[in-house]
Amino acid sequence: MPEITSYTYAHRARLVKPFLSYDLSAFALSFLPAAGEEVVSPAPVRPGPDDRASRDDGYTYHHLRRDVFDMARAGGVDIESRYVVPSAHITLGRYLSHEDHGTPEARRAWVDKINQINAWLENEVWNNHGCGFIGEWIVGQERGLDARCGPLWYGMGRTICVGEGF
């Protein structure tokens, strides 16, 4: 298990351009795989492996997902994903009822606010290194992957092992 949870220590994938996304059940902070954007995260603590992956983005989030999936399956783990399309996101909240978005006007106001925040992220955070926010996420920075068992969505399941961060 530690081989999988600490995999990001030597296989670093960068995610950039944070934006709010939503569907019928929740909203999240989502990211895109890096494709040559300037690295703005602080350097990892040494000693560490050659950090080529997070410098040239040759190893992407999609590679990481594939590799971890393959290792888990090779170990006999049956994986049931909630989403068919790969997604890099942090769920911020779930809708518990339809009260707050019960009218077309309320839904429009919600979407307008999300669009306003996304415009701010794009204009003020994505390429503005002096704004006080870091608009990227190097997977494994600070802590490794979190291996969990049981249904993982909606905060369920439990942690079995957390990998080494950098």
Summary of predicted features, one role per range:
Residues M1-F166:
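Histidine-dependent nucleotide/RNA phosphoesterase domain, centered on the 2H-phosphoesterase fold
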